């Protein structure tokens, strides 16, 4: 942070302390020369950095510009307390999670250990049937007859061991497959294995004419983590030696997985096979051997920290609209990326290291000077060690020479700058904008941080909110008890939110040094009249207060609301800033903000049908989903901020008309990392940055509301100058996918901004214009966007709300692609 910014921040924090002192009572007697770190006061006040109403009533400690609850007497050890021989805490902690909206909540089992269902894990017995029995128990959503369900969540846990399987493991909808994080178990494919993949997330129905268990674009809420998958017993020439069939959509993750495959010359093995979908995030993956590390086709995906060793082809891209790869290591592969062009529309690769690989990137077609012929490609900070060709065509033509060197910034596609509506096709070096040092690790790469799993901690380092009195039954008001638990145990214990639906009717404050862990996406939801007034919005979950610093880690949680009218709900206000010495120290992983469309929200098809007959008042889902405030930092990985467009429960298909005002608003001075995030269907905007600085965003994905422009944005919300950009002048405005105002140091590396409907009709797709404009950057901002894909937006980028770049100049299959745009 520049000195001027830092001084301003400290002054404003000091002013805040003055406000607190004037609003409350300073009960201590303090000498004028007393160090600030030693001042303690009791304060009652109503203060929020957003201006929204937030009740603060707690004893606080003022410590080096921090306002925080009194520290616990026994802080959580920084490096954990578990001995190497201790079991992974998840295996032995008390499991009392529930699914309160299940027809039989008292008997439904959320957590299930595969060994309780007969799995042996000795590498000899066939455990496939036992594992699938553990997955299926409880009348869960699978088999092809259930399009989706949130009322049968499950964690299927694998203790350490080797699990031999002769048939596929099929994770049903809303399933987390979790292995022992201390000693990841091995899933070993039998020599006779002949199914599609060892783990199949969307099976084809036998004799079903190509039908599958779930619609791929709606195959939400899945996670697989902590496994070694070994297919080397399967004959090398059999493609059934595939680790994971991963045809999925948003709110899905793969993490901490190693796949071992044959390295024979005739190998047909694959690490991941993915033919369709709309993802998604995956990270911390290693693929050894095989014909393909990843064989992939999907609208969009974010991949972080991927290593592929000794594969014939590291990544085979059969089609996409836009993928972002961050932190890629390719070693001893014949081809790093094999892109089937032009149907692979856009590939963006940052912080890659490629070693002893003849071809880093190969396109199947030559560009011949046009985007449409070979798609868009962006490389940023790619280090080559003994690489024959950096970019080549399948016919042998070398586009960019290899060697041992670093490619700072290079691209293939249409490049634009500022307000100039005329782009140029480039196949060469691109301007390489500087990135804020706060966004980078010690080696100059964008920071990436693995999903915390606390494998070095014992079960006794955790407390259960249900043990401490919270109900999570979807009915009881848990506001008071959750505030008490968080106040008491932040920094002392890891707080385990047993599976359930926790209702709060007032602000819940999440203090610095809170580590909170959900179970199969525990739901925390705001409800009631305090969140009903959009003229006076109120925070539901407040993560830190303005000027507070500290560790915050939130994993496997869903923040939500309960209708009928929560038009004033700011669902999450993020004020916390990471400690200076801990990059990405304040973040969320595999946690989402989801409103409407599921059991328990009162915002389903029965309440808010697509035709709008229920009216606005009954169908407000929130005012603003996520507000990252000025003094905050944030690391968000795999976070989906989704206003439901259809029911996930009920028939799983019916479209609904529910209304959320705004998606993600950031005013942060940084650092902020938005890695593999999405924001969809909010009335005014999906992403907005205002007076912000030092953001890395890649990949971001949006969809505009299906009902717009009937009514047009911002209806049914009133224009609010404190939270909203000025509406653009159009006869029927729709929501901004992205709006950036008075911001600097904004680095967007992969964006998919989509508009699929116009007043619930898709006829506009044919004309490629379901809305007039979709991304706006003002002239006061410094922004660089790489690999922007849009769907059916007339103007892809606007400057000061005036459309500049017409999509027709950048048609790239179904999408239109801008390879690079810089504001200056």
Positions of predicted regions on the chain:
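Extracellular "leader-to-stem" segments immediately downstream of a signal peptide or signal-anchor
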Residues: 2-155, 168-170, 182-243, 247-255, ...
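Beta-strand cores of modular interaction/reader domains in eukaryotic scaffold and signaling proteins
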Residues: 113, 157-159, 176-178, 496-498, ...
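Tight coil/turn sites that cap or link beta-strands
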Residues: 160-162, 174, 499-500, 507, ...
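Internal alpha-helical scaffold/solenoid segments in large eukaryotic proteins
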Residues: 167, 175, 289-291, 299-315, ...
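Classical protein tyrosine phosphatase
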Residues: 167-168, 172-180, 504-522, 685-686, ...
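Active-site proximal loops enriched in glycine and acidic residues that flank catalytic Cys/His/Asp
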Residues: 319, 341, 365, 499, ...
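C-terminal, well-structured subdomains that either form a transmembrane helix-short loop-helix hairpin
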Residues: 484, 488-489, 494-507, 660-689, ...
């Amino acid at each position: 942070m520049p000195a001027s910014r830092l001084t301003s921040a400290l002054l404003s924090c000091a002013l805040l302390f003055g406000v607190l002192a004037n609003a409350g009572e300073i009960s201590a007697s303090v000498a004028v020369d007393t160090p600030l770190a030693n001042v303690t006061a009791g304060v009652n006040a109503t203060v929020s950095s957003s201006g929204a109403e937030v009740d603060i009533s707690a004893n606080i400690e003022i410590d080096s510009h921090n306002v925080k609850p009194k520290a616990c007497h026994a802080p959580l050890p920084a490096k954990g307390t578990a001995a190497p021989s201790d079991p992974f805490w998840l295996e032995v902690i008390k499991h009392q999670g529930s699914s309160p909206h299940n027809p039989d909540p008292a008997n439904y089992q959320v957590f299930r250990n595969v060994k309780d269902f007969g799995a042996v894990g000795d590498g000899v017995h066939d455990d496939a049937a036992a594992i699938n029995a553990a997955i299926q128990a409880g009348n869960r959503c699978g088999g092809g007859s259930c399009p989706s369900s949130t009322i049968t969540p499950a964690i299927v846990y694998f203790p350490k061991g080797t699990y031999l399987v002769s048939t596929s493991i099929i994770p049903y909808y809303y399933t987390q497959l979790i292995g022992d994080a201390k000693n990841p178990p091995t899933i070993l494919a039998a020599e006779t294995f002949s199914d599609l993949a060892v783990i199949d997330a969307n099976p084809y129905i036998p004799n079903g004419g190509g039908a599958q268990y779930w619609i791929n674009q709606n195959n939400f809420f899945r996670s697989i983590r902590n496994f070694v998958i070994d297919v080397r017993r399967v004959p090398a020439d059999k493609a059934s030696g595939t680790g994971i069939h991963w045809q999925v959509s948003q709110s899905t993750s793969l993490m901490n997985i190693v796949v071992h495959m044959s390295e024979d010359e005739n190998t047909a093995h694959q690490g991941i096979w993915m033919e369709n979908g709309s993802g998604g995030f995956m990270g911390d993956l290693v693929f050894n051997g095989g014909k393909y590390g990843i064989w992939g086709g999907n609208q969009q995906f974010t991949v972080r920290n991927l290593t592929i060793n000794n594969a014939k082809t590291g990544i085979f891209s059969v089609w996409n609209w836009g993928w972002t790869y961050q932190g890629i290591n390719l070693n001893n592969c014949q081809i790093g990326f094999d892109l089937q062009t032009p149907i692979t529309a856009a590939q963006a690769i940052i912080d890659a290291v490629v070693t002893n690989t003849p071809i880093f990137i190969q396109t199947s077609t030559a560009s011949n000077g046009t985007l449409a012929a070979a798609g868009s490609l962006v490389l940023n900070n790619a280090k080559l060690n003994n690489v024959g060709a950096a970019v080549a065509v399948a016919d042998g033509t070398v586009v960019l020479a290899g060697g041992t060197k670093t490619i700072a910034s290079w691209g293939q596609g249409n490049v634009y700058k500022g307000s100039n509506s005329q782009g140029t096709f480039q196949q060469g070096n691109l301007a390489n904008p500087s990135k804020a040092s706060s966004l980078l690790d010690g080696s100059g790469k964008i920071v990436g941080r693995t999903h915390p799993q606390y494998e070095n901690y014992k079960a006794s380092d955790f407390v259960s909110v249900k043990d401490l009195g919270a109900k999570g039954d979807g009915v009881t008001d848990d506001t008071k008890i959750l505030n008490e638990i968080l106040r008491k145990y932040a920094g002392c214990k890891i707080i385990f939110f047993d599976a359930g639906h926790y209702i709060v009717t007032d602000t819940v404050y999440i203090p610095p040094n809170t580590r909170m862990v959900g179970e199969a996406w525990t739901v925390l939801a705001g409800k009631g009249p305090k969140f009903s007034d959009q003229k006076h919005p109120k925070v539901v979950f407040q993560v830190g207060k303005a000027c507070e610093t500290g560790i915050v880690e939130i994993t496997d949680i869903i923040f939500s609301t309960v209708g009928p009218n929560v038009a004033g709900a700011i669902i999450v206000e993020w004020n916390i800033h990471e400690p200076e010495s801990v990059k990405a120290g304040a973040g969320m992983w595999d946690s989402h903000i989801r409103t409407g469309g599921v059991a328990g929200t009162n915002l389903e098809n029965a309440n808010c049908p697509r035709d709008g007959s229920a009216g606005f008042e009954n169908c407000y889902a929130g005012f603003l989903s996520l507000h990252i405030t000025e003094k905050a930092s944030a690391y968000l990985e795999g976070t989906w901020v989704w206003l439901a467009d259809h029911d996930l429960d009920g028939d799983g298909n019916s479209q609904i008309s529910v209304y959320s005002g705004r998606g993600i608003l950031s005013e942060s001075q940084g650092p902020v990392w938005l890695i593999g995030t999405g924001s969809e269907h909010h009335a005014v905007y999906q992403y907005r940055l205002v007076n912000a600085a030092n953001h890395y965003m890649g990949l971001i994905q949006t969809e505009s509301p299906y009902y717009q422009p009937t009514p047009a944005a911002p209806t049914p919300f009133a224009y609010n100058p404190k939270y909203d950009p000025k509406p653009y002048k159009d006869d029927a405005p729709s929501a901004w996918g992205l709006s950036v105002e008075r911001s600097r140091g904004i680095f967007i590396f992969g964006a998919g901004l989509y508009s699929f409907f116009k007043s619930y009709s898709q006829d506009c797709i044919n004309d490629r214009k379901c809305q007039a404009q979709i991304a706006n950057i003002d002239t006061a901002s410094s922004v660089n966007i790489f690999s922007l894909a849009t769907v059916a937006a007339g103007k892809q980028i606007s400057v000061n709300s005036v459309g500049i770049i017409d999509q027709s100049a950048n048609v790239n299959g179904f999408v239109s692609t801008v390879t690079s745009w810089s504001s200056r």
